[in-house]
């Protein structure tokens, strides 16, 4: 039985979570993204003190590794790597989009499409089923009124995240569902424990966040004519 620290600074708010295996024993968050760099160390210290657990008892650290805020990702990854290096414990990286789906799994939908705002009409996105199987790989796309049209003909898709508002203004399909769902470090726990059991670890020395830079030149226009299921 082991303690795990989970860090998320990828989107709007920063949060840290302490779990005893899959059981959450402590959680703290900070809603201001611009304060993540100054808050994260203090937040972790306060979390551990409130829980009465020493850092030396941690078995691993997990971090939301992107896509997301460039600055936020750097802050979270640097913090996680520093702790893992100092404590000589494994680093576990979790895709931010998949973390978001964990927060939405109990919703009534066949497929889940988290969207992270990029710029203009662009979003980082992917599509997953209830078992977190990747239906459409994470990528950056330019939204239009034909995006996801082929899948929406036969499947109900839940769109959520801080980029989904842009798509809600475009799409008319009855199979397109929208809901505000907040994801945070607590939603890293299950995947992180599974990765730990399977010894799926990142390289502490060379691991970098997934910024999604490659998709900016140019961004994929939309999902129509591609990614059929």
Residue ranges and their predicted role:
Residues 17, 124-128, 210:
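Conserved hydrophobic/aromatic positions in well-ordered beta-strands
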Residues 177-229:
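Acyltransferase
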Residues 23, 90-183, 216-217:
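Surface "functional belts" at beta-alpha junctions
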Residues 60-96:
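DPxDG-like acidic metal-binding loop motif
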Residues 1-65:
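N-terminal beta-alpha supersecondary unit
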Residues 31-42, 70, 74, 78, ...:
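Residues at secondary-structure transition points
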Residues 47-51, 86, 104, 185-196:
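Stable alpha-helical structural segments in soluble proteins, enriched in small hydrophobic residues
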């Amino acid at each position: 039985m082991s303690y795990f620290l989970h860090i998320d600074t990828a989107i709007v708010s920063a949060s840290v979570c302490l779990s005893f295996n899959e059981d959450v024993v402590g959680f703290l968050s900070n809603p201001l993204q611009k304060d993540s760099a100054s808050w994260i160390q203090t937040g972790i210290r306060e979390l551990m003190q409130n829980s009465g657990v020493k850092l030396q008892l941690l078995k691993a650290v997990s971090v939301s590794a992107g896509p997301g805020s460039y600055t936020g990702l750097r802050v979270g990854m640097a913090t996680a790597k520093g702790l893992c290096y100092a404590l000589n414990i494994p680093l576990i990286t979790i895709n931010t989009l998949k973390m978001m789906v964990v927060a939405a799994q109990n919703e009534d939908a066949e497929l889940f499409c988290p969207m992270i705002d990029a710029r203009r009409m662009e979003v980082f996105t992917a599509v997953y089923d209830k078992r977190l199987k990747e239906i459409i790989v994470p990528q950056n796309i330019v939204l239009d009124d034909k995006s996801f049209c082929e899948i929406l003909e036969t499947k109900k898709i839940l769109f959520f995240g801080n980029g989904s508002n842009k798509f809600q203004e475009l799409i008319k399909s009855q199979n397109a569902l929208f809901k505000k769902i907040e994801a945070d470090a607590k939603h890293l726990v299950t995947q992180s424990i599974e990765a730990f059991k399977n010894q799926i670890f990142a390289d502490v020395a060379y691991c970098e966040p997934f910024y999604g830079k490659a998709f900016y030149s140019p961004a994929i226009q939309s999902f129509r004519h591609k990614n059929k299921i």
